[in-house]
UniProtKB/Swiss-Prot annotation:
Pathway connected to this protein: Cofactor biosynthesis; adenosylcobalamin biosynthesis; cob(II)yrinate a,c-diamide from sirohydrochlorin (anaerobic route): step 6/10
EC id: 2.1.1.195
Reactions mediated catalytically: Co-precorrin-5B + S-adenosyl-L-methionine = Co-precorrin-6A + S-adenosyl-L-homocysteine
Keyword S-adenosyl-L-methionine: yes
Protein name, entry field: Cobalt-precorrin-5B C(1)-methyltransferase
GO molecular function: cobalt-precorrin-5B C1-methyltransferase activity
The entry's keywords: Cobalamin biosynthesis, Methyltransferase, S-adenosyl-L-methionine, Transferase
NCBIfam families, per the entry: cbiD
InterPro entries documented for this protein: CbiD, CbiD_sf
BP GO annotations: anaerobic cobalamin biosynthetic process; methylation
């Protein structure tokens, strides 16, 4: 990525969005400038780094401080126009020079600790991912030269509080934020980074020994699993709108059973072969309902009423009034059929189940008895 492409906005739905930089870039810049300040013994207020993607960032330094052979500096995280829990917080680095010739990197206050397998870092280590570890160590080495050593501590006083707004606790990263970023640049509303974070949770579940997974669109699905199915929510992973992607990831990781649980407003799209359920990709909810109601022999009056509905909930009221509630079992079976069609070239496809529920947490339908599915999930 060139500097020009970094400055150029990302266009989403006709709106220009500004790029930002990652916590990894902040930590790298903070460590570099702290190392330089120790060597030069004077405060520095601006520092430049080259990100892994080749972009040169020139960043303002905050809270610079020197005390003997130790210096501290901070960089303020700027996520651009991305929705980011770490936006605006300070990422600090403390660099202490020594004669060991080695660079050691640790995480201090506000940096999470890895407590589960699956994130690619040793248990008990600081949640500083591999790419930022490399860039931090390289930047410090460049600053101090080949002979000196340094102890580098990355810390973030707001980290523990900010981490409450992230997926870290679900990933087994406790006590703070993660220092992340493979490119060093934050692309606003990047689907790829969002998908990757969801997939990472799948990897952690699999690494913990789970072989069966429940995919839900969001928090409502997890609550239903806990309250109505009596199943440990450790098996639940959010798929958001990325149904096809998360199913393929679950297959790649070797899960033997995938259970899709959600409200018809989301899952009905899968019955039509739509595996990205965001409304800007496709809708077809009413068309799908009308088609399958017709297959079940629904009267034209009901088909017309459903066709004119704007929401799935409104359509469900008509379906109930006409006594066609059995469509939900039919749709659940159709969802499973569509998933198996998508996985038709998979050598050992997993068992697929689907459960539909209402907003008041009542079971609407499933491809087979829910008790049977729940029993298997508890094995």
């Amino acid at each position: 990525m060139s500097e020009l492409s970094f400055d150029a906005p990302v266009w989403r739905h006709g709106k220009a969005l500004r790029k930002g930089y990652t916590t990894g870039s902040c930590a790298t810049a903070a460590a570099k400038v702290a190392a330089l300040m120790v060597l030069r013994q004077h405060l520095i207020h601006q520092v430049s780094i080259v990100t892994p993607s080749g972009v040169t960032l020139c960043l303002n330094v905050e809270s610079p401080h020197i005390e003997g052979q130790q210096a501290i500096a901070a960089i303020r995280k700027d996520g651009g126009d991305d929705v980011d829990a770490t936006h605006g917080m300070l990422i600090f680095a403390r660099v202490t020079l020594n004669d060991s010739g080695e660079i050691t990197l640790t995480g201090g206050e506000g940096i999470g600790t890895v407590t589960r397998k699956g994130v690619g870092l040793p248990l008990g280590s600081a949640a500083i991912n591999r790419t930022p570890r490399h860039t931090i160590e390289s930047a410090v080495r460049e600053a101090i030269g080949p002979a000196r050593g340094a102890d580098v501590e990355i810390f973030a006083p707001e980290g523990e509080a900010r981490a409450q707004k992230t997926y870290n606790s679900r990933l087994g990263i406790l006590g703070g934020i993660s220092i992340i970023g493979t490119t060093g640049i934050v692309t606003p509303m990047s689907e790829e980074s969002w998908k990757r974070s969801l997939s990472l949770e799948l990897e952690i579940k699999r690494a913990s020994g789970l072989t069966r997974v429940i995919l839900v669109p969001g928090n409502h699905g997890e609550r239903f699993v806990r309250e109505q199915m009596g199943v440990d929510t450790q098996a639940v992973v959010t798929m958001s709108n990325f149904v096809g992607y998360m199913i393929e990831e679950a297959v790649r990781l070797g899960f033997c059973q995938i259970v899709l649980v959600g409200h018809p407003g989301k899952l009905i799209k899968i019955a039509a072969g739509i595996f990205h359920t965001h409304s800007h990709i496709a809708d077809a909810r009413m068309e799908t309902l009308v088609a399958h109601l017709a297959l079940l022999g629904a009267p034209l009056e009901l088909l017309t009423l459903v066709s004119d509905c704007d929401t799935t909930e409104a359509a469900m009221e008509h379906i109930e009034a006409y006594g066609f509630g059995h469509i939900y079992n039919h749709l659940a079976r159709r969802i499973c059929l569509r998933v198996m069609q998508m996985l038709r070239f998979t050598k050992t496809p997993p068992v697929c189940d689907a459960i539909l529920f209402s907003f008041d947490n009542h079971i609407l339908g499933s491809n087979r008895p829910v008790d049977e599915i729940a029993k298997e999930l508890q094995c």
